[in-house]
Curated annotation (Swiss-Prot):
Primary residence: nucleus
Gene: JBP2
Name of the molecule in the record: Bifunctional helicase and thymine dioxygenase JBP2
Motif, DEAH box: chain positions: 659-662
Pfam families: Helicase_C (PF00271), SNF2-rel_dom (PF00176), Tet_JBP (PF12851)
Limits of the Helicase ATP-binding domain: 533-708
GO molecular function: ATP binding; ATP hydrolysis activity; DNA binding; DNA translocase activity; helicase activity; metal ion binding; thymine dioxygenase activity
């Protein structure tokens, strides 16, 4: 069944339903949708189906194999052994009567299963019997056309039978295999360290994931490679030039080479750095890894594939393989010889690295996961090149805070120097010479002098692959450890106790959690927890950048529990904005029933609190030795931290967690200075939006968790990279290539410091920008109060200017704001900085303005309209109010709920009063509300079906709250920082949301469109840095109105009706509707 080249989510689901229902394979041609390949693979794997990389240029989706590998081998061997037709019929009869355990499909099936799984198995058995005695040519011919030969366990079974046939031992009884399997599992269990395979059992570091994992699940085999070959370092660039020796200064003496500023190391050259005998021993073992089976023709002049290969570990993130992060095929098959010959070489190279570049080495040692270390070095991977004169290129995917190590290990040749264009130097390398260098710089080999004669040059580049530290690899690793725990029945025994998640690998730092908590921790949270604990165990910190709604608070509480699970008392300091302190308290109480209990959990928002003062007094007594010492968790408002530290002299937390940690990135932040005084290096930053206004924020965040990064990537260099990206975002198309290069570098650089998950497995999000019109009265007020004859007269607006937002709400709201009517709504409570700014602006406006007779007449007219029941005419004075009422009527008809965010007290109050007039039941959360009142309001909103919407402040309600009872989000006004609005949307669009979420961004033709331009530029920057995309802001004139292309019939009707609704003065209530996703244009650069 062929499928179009571009596959939407709906189409893909339909294809999977067809395959699952009928048992018929489906073929997809991926040539034009390579960016969607990971999505296809993930969906197919999630439903237990299989992928094969044929036909050429395509992928075949097959139904799950309904039988284990052992059972399949038994049937195939018995069928092949049969000598008569009757014996084969007996085997077929046995298969037909077999009890196949079919998985319940996760898909919603249109009908019952329409095929017999026995027929599927018989097809496999017959295929293997036909090929068991075939020649190699016949077998390879079949491999090119038979998808079943590309999947496991079929591939393994056929290969095993062919090997047995060729050796004359075809009739080995199946029970022998089972006995061997049981004995191997028992041996591993007795060793106590299931994680180490035979090849790594000597404690030299770096365990073999795939070899041991195959014993756990035969259907999850690391050898399965759906491309038919291991796609390593796929060079897709255009063919580039070769370098000539005459254009460079040839370096023959050891030395260190810096950039022009003298701050940044580009290369370190060492003559005779490694003994020749060590090099030559290594060459004997790994030279054969260099083959022409690769995709690097572009860096070999574009003519043929060079002789090159990979030894060690690799991240096959772009391959449709079941295992992404694992050893290469050569490593698996030749490990014993690699161990004997390469270990001394790599250990010597590792020592040399630590001595010559200690800062780079330290950062690389912190970054590399233990299970990917080759012989306990800082190298995960070796690229072996034989007679390979590389053209100019940069190496992608290397650890950017470290250096790669190039060494010639064997050969007879002249020339072929390694030249670095930016340095203008070519380094002469003979056997034993070493060059540590920055592989992000353009480099290549000069000509070979004796090319016409017999020459040989074998070199190896040793480095750390960034992808091995990715969240994909971390999640794979976590799944593997969990399987090992299930195998040892540790999870079953721990449901009522505390368990160490890393118990099966003693080389990993322990992660202690209540057994019951594992039931609710998502795979992403467990992977992030493993990442954090690994970094903390090495005396370093990290940034946890999970998109909103993925559970950063629960993750942090679990981290605190594990960190404090020690006989020695430890203290944790959590800094959280005042508006989310109640959320922390609520989460702590919520998870107590799962065993997440803390003896002392002290929360303070900075206000006078008797309970807080009592807690501080007792803690001081513990520090002074008057009471027994116990562990404490302090959750403090950052604005109050200075006062707390003054009261707690001698307070030394062993872990600092900063929630909404982007605040630490502010220039000249006093908070950073105060935290530095605590002398705690274990620092964790939580942020769904680590990049908000500029790329330098991310640089400062990472610099705070590890200041060493500044020495390997100076601020000036990072600023230049960020500036290149900004040029492209702001419309300079000529900067695209440079921007992509800068993005890639920053992405690779941040990988080892930031655990980032920006995508979620949630229902669809439909996000719209609705351009609302102005009534003639609003336009006149615009002219009278802002001195403009038209809306197009303003091209900029100050962030402190609040009057336009109240005008776009409604003329009556505007008059109330500038005359001070809403002042009384603020009460006497302490205001947030935003509310204080609004109040100051309001007071300033009221000092300059008194209501005129026309204003008073308008107020009387508005009140008359309301009192007379002419509500449509009343809201018709404002485009936004007209749109809001129509949207809420539509939501109420569907018996759904909405949350409405606005920055301004005046707008919130006006909306609330208007909704009451329309009999639309709503609730409101104010900044001054106490925790208990806020909790009751939220609970009532969730449970009371009569309540249609909840009104709250963008600044207060955008953090920490869970409103998944609502699936509509209305953003009443726009704010300069788009991540504040992203936080607001995440109150509804988060874990536990089961329905599609619709976002309505109500934008006036005046102030909102100006703010949106700034928002979109910042959003493009965020996508550039946090996602592998070249993103830029789309000019407003290029945006397309989506009313007529809207797929949802209900929304299409709503948009059209709003366009046909007219305001006072005759302007339409809505002029255009855009999809928010269309405002940023992105291209994948991976």
């Amino acid at each position: 069944m062929p499928v179009p080249s571009h596959v939407s989510v709906a189409t893909l689901q339909s294809v999977l339903q067809t395959v699952c229902s009928t048992g018929e394979p489906a073929i997809i041609a991926p040539s034009s949708f390579l960016g969607e390949l990971d999505t296809v693979v993930d969906e197919v794997k999630r439903h237990g189906m299989k992928l094969a990389s044929i036909p050429h240029g395509g992928i075949t989706i097959l139904p799950p194999v309904p039988i284990s590998g052992t059972e399949l081998f038994d049937f195939c061997a018995e069928y092949c052994k049969a000598q008569t037709h009757e014996e084969r019929l007996a085997v077929r009869h046995k298969i037909n009567n077999h009890n196949f355990l079919m998985q319940d499909p996760l898909l919603r099936m249109p009908c019952r299963q329409l095929y017999n799984p026995a027929d599927y198995v018989l097809r496999i058995v017959h295929l293997c019997s036909e090929l068991v005695s075939a020649s190699e040519e016949e077998y390879h011919g079949a491999y090119g056309v038979a998808p079943l030969l590309h999947i496991n366990p079929v591939q393994d079974v056929c290969g095993k039978l062919r090997s047995m046939f060729q050796s004359g031992s075809l009739y080995v009884k199946p029970w022998i295999l089972e006995e061997e399997e049981e004995r191997r599992e028992m041996d591993e269990s007795n060793r106590g360290v299931l994680f180490n395979s035979d090849s790594f059992g000597n404690g030299r570091g770096g365990s073999s994931i795939s070899s041991s994992e195959r014993s756990v699940d035969e259907n999850d085999v690391a050898d399965e490679d759906l491309t038919g070959e291991e796609v390593v370092d796929n060079a897709t660039d255009t063919v580039v030039e070769y370098l000539s020796e005459k254009d460079f200064d040839v370096v023959t003496e050891s030395g260190i080479f810096y950039d022009d500023s003298g701050e940044r190391v580009h290369a370190i050259y060492l003559r005779g750095g490694i003994k020749k005998e060590l090099c030559q021993r290594a060459a004997i073992a790994i030279e054969e890894a260099a083959t022409t089976k690769n995709l690097r023709k572009a860096v070999n002049g574009g003519k043929t594939n060079p002789e090159t290969g990979i030894v060690g570990y690799y991240d096959y993130l772009n391959n449709p393989t079941q295992r992404k992060c694992r050893e290469t095929e050569f490593t698996r098959k030749n490990w014993s010889s690699v161990v004997d010959s390469c270990e001394p070489f790599l250990v010597a190279l590792n020592k040399l690295y630590s001595e010559c570049a200690p800062t780079h080495y330290k950062l690389q040692r912190i970054a590399i996961p233990h299970h990917y270390q080759l012989f306990n070095t800082v190298f995960s991977t070796m690229t072996v090149n034989r007679n390979f004169r590389t053209a100019v290129h940069t190496d992608r995917g290397d650890f950017r805070s470290g250096l790669a190590a190039l060494c010639v290990i064997d050969g007879v040749f002249e020339g072929c120097h390694l030249a670095i264009k930016k340095l203008g130097k070519a380094f002469r390398l003979e056997t034993g010479d070493v060059l540590f260098f920055d592989t992000s710089l353009e480099h290549g080999n000069t000509e070979v002098h004796n090319f016409d004669y017999c020459w040989k040059r074998v070199s190896v580049v040793c480095y750390l692959r960034n992808g091995l530290m990715s969240q994909i690899c971390e999640m794979e690793r976590r799944r593997w450890l969990q399987k090992q725990m299930l195998k040892q029945r540790l999870l079953d025994r721990s449901r009522q106790s505390v368990i160490n998640l890393n118990a099966t690998d003693p080389n990993l730092p322990p992660i202690y959690l209540p057994g019951r908590l594992l039931e609710v921790l998502s795979p992403v949270q467990q992977a992030a927890l493993g990442f954090v604990v690994d970094r903390l165990s090495k005396g370093n910190g990290c940034v946890i950048a999970l998109t909103m709604g993925l559970g950063k608070t629960l993750l942090s509480l679990a981290l605190c529990y594990s960190h404090m699970y020690d006989q020695n008392p430890r203290d944790v300091l959590i800094l959280a904005p005042k508006i989310v302190l109640t959320h922390w308290t609520g989460e702590k109480q919520k998870w107590e029933k799962y065993g997440l209990v803390f003896s002392h959990f002290v929360v303070s928002d900075g206000t006078d609190s008797v309970s807080f003062e009592i807690a501080l007094k007792r803690y001081k007594q513990q520090l002074n030795g008057e009471l027994p010492r116990t562990s404490h968790v302090f959750v403090i408002n950052p604005e109050y931290i200075r006062t707390v530290l003054k009261k707690l002299t001698g307070f030394r937390p062993s872990l600092i967690i900063v929630d909404e940690g982007h605040r630490v990135s502010s220039k000249g932040s006093k908070l950073k200075d105060w935290l530095e005084g605590l002398r705690c290096t274990a620092r964790v930053i939580l942020s769904g939006t680590p990049v908000q206004n500029n790329a330098e924020e991310l640089y400062r965040l990472i610099g705070w968790i590890n200041s060493d990064v500044h020495s390997v990537l100076p601020p000036r260099v990072f600023t230049d990279l960020a500036g290149t990206i900004n040029r492209y975002i702001n419309g300079d198309d000529s900067a695209l290539a440079a921007a992509v290069s800068a993005q890639r570098y920053i992405q690779e650089w941040m990988c080892s410091y930031v655990f980032s998950v920006m995508k979620t497995d949630l229902p669809p999000l439909n996000d719209y920008i609705i351009i609302c019109g102005f009534s003639s009265i609003q336009r006149k007020m615009l002219e009278d109060h802002f001195g403009m004859e038209g809306i197009d007269g303003l091209t900029s607006i100050k962030a402190s200017e609040h009057r336009p937002y109240h005008l776009s709400t409604h003329p009556l709201c505007f008059l109330g704001f500038i005359s001070g009517v809403y002042k009384s709504l603020n009460g006497n409570h302490k205001l947030t900085p935003e509310a204080e700014e609004e109040l100051e602006s309001q007071e300033y406006a009221s000092q300059l303005y008194s209501l005129t007779e026309d204003d008073i007449g308008l107020i009387d007219e508005c009140l008359s309209l309301v009192n007379s029941g002419f509500l449509t005419e009343f809201v018709g004075l404002s485009g936004k109010m007209t749109v809001l009422i129509s949207i809420l009527h539509s939501i109420r008809e569907k018996k759904e709920k909405a949350i409405i965010f606005s920055q301004y007290v005046g707008s919130q109050d006006f909306i609330s009063r208007t909704l009451t007039s329309f009999d639309i039941v709503s609730s409101t959360i104010r900044g001054r509300d106490c925790h208990e009142r806020r909790r009751r309001t939220i609970e009532k909103f969730r449970e009371d079906e009569k309540i249609t919407c909840l009104l709250l402040s963008t600044q207060i309600g955008a953090y920490g709250l869970d409103f998944t009872a609502a699936n509509h989000v209305i953003l009443w006004d726009s704010w300069w920082n788009p991540q504040v609005e992203s936080q607001a949307i995440a109150r509804a669009y988060r874990r536990n949301q089961t329905r599609a979420v619709i976002v309505y961004r109500l934008a006036s033709e005046f102030e909102d469109t100006i703010v949106l331009k700034t928002q979109i530029r910042k959003l493009a920057l965020f996508r550039c840095i946090m996602n592998e995309e070249a993103s830029r802001a789309v000019p407003p004139e290029e945006l397309l109105d989506c009313v007529d292309t809207e797929e949802d019939e209900g929304r299409r009707f709503l948009w059209r009706s709003l366009k046909k609704s007219y305001l006072e003065g005759g302007a339409p209530a809505v002029s255009k509707v855009f999809r928010h996703g269309d405002t940023v244009r992105s291209e994948s650069w991976s």
